[in-house]
Amino acid sequence: MASARTDPIPTSQPEPEAARQAGGEQPAIRAAGLAKSYGPTVALAGLDLHVAAGETVALLGPNGAGKTTTIGLLVGLLHPDRGQVQVYGRPPSQAVAGGLVGAMLQDAGLMPGVRVGELLAMVRGLYPRPLPPGELVALADLGPVLGRRADRLSGGQAQRVRFAVAIAGDPRLLLLDEPTAAMDVQARRNFWAQIHRYTARGRTVLFATHYLQEADDAADRVVVIAGGRKVADGTPAAIKARFGDQQVRFTLLQGSPALLAALDGVRAVDRDGPRVTLRSSDTDATVAALVRSGLRWSGLDVGGGDLETSFLRLLAETS
């Protein structure tokens, strides 16, 4: 397999750094040429990453792409072999020590034998200007479990406690590494509602996730890394427009499904019973060909592809 291309594929018109940082505000994250290896294994191979203050950015990539390593560098737990990284103009360790950064890391443990309310009080005491206790509990939706032991919660409840611990100091930047991995669908929806309430305060969020629908719904911008490098950077809509086939969906009432693949613009045909989805490079041409085909159909709908399909095509094109 060929090595991953080194230049990120543009997915939107670049926005000047000066425009993003109007008023002279420091960018939340500025990283250039980050390289990190673990013995012979290369985790990052020259990653550049800029995140403006107030943005919500999703960090996507296949397993082993370097997402967790990137977050480890941003919280100062790791040090790059090469390259530079600053968080609000400071080295990451100084930004963390100054209370500017909160983080939810994968598999972070919770103190055994301590009740949730006690844990939150202890964590708040570590910061000079913590969130008020009532606001912290409300943001993390922890009221019903304050009296329970932190080590006896469900996976989703424990993640909400980790979220509360991460925001207890009212950080300007919140780093999330697979934050909803232990949650069911409803718990994930509730969690992102909590994140939206937090970002409404002007806070910055960078999150890594394997749930691409979360990135589509929650992120202002998506950064895709593969092979330790950035391969795409743009809004979810821009990435879907660049890499995702448009779709023509309808119910096939009569006619041979074999004719569908030959319609103009059709790249692939997906069927779920009588419901058909045509992935098309030119939906106008596909619809016109469908009308001329003699097939009987109903319930026509034309729309964009999803971020997951775009992500898979992007990875295929950059490997």
Residue ranges and their predicted role:
Residues 34, 121, 125, 131-146:
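Conserved ABC ATPase "signature" region
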Residues 192-281:
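ABC transporter nucleotide-binding domain
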Residues 149-156:
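Conserved ABC ATPase signature
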Residues 174-178:
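Catalytic Walker B motif of ABC-type/P-loop ATPase nucleotide-binding domains
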Residues 29, 44-46:
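Conserved structural motif at the start of ABC-family nucleotide-binding domains
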Residues 75, 83-97:
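Conserved ABC transporter NBD signature motif
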Residues 2-12, 281-319:
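C-terminal coupling/interaction segments
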